[in-house]
């Protein structure tokens, strides 16, 4: 959400409300609590790739906001197809058990594209900073899905961080209307 807020300010001259900024900080605190245990080990390469992915996602939201007439379904379908074509070659489904394969197929074939379609459509009605507030909920949901599907019990920090994330997103998106700046982007 931080990158989406900054980029929408730079590219679209959209302001982010103080309430949304507070929610962003609180949400990021929850994410740090969730991943805090894994931050101590490993190299920086994975962190840099994750940071790059977050920045590309923010750029994506800003582009959707700037161009509300882009055909959402077509663009999401084309990008999903390209993603499939790029990843199908190196993938080896025989390395996954049946549950993992079904979960992967469900995510890539249904949940991922539907989520991207919803996100891209939401930018017609809300600034990228607010739309991106929903993405940290995916981190919480992923932990729950792994718990339900694979019986991998999340750490206590995951529950605490997840509660912080959900409460922060709820706080950021349910405030009084005067605290939300619904100003639409200026067309180029």
Enumerate the predicted regions with their spans.
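A helix-boundary/kink motif common to multi-pass secondary transporters
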Residues: 12-17, 71-72, 127-128, 150-154
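C-terminal ends of transmembrane helices
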Residues: 2-16, 58-70, 116-123, 173
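Transmembrane alpha-helical segments that form core, pore/gating elements
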Residues: 4-6, 39-94, 104, 183-188
């Amino acid at each position: 959400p931080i990158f989406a807020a900054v980029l929408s300010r730079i590219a679209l001259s959209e302001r982010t409300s103080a309430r949304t900024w507070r929610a962003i900080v609180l949400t990021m605190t929850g994410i740090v609590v969730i991943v805090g245990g894994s931050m101590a080990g490993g190299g920086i390469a994975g962190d840099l790739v994750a940071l790059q992915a977050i920045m590309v996602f923010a750029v994506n939201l800003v582009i959707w906001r700037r161009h509300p007439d882009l055909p959402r379904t077509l663009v999401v379908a084309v990008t999903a197809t390209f993603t499939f074509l790029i990843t199908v070659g190196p993938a080896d489904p025989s390395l996954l058990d049946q549950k993992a394969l079904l979960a992967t197929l469900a995510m890539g074939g249904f949940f991922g594209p539907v989520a991207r379609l919803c996100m891209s459509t939401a930018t017609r009605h809300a600034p990228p900073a607010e739309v991106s507030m929903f993405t940290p909920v995916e981190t919480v949901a992923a932990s729950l899905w792994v718990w339900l599907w694979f019986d991998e019990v999340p750490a206590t920090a995951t529950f605490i961080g997840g509660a912080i994330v959900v409460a922060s997103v709820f706080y950021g998106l349910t405030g009084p209307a005067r605290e939300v700046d619904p100003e639409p982007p200026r067309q180029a």
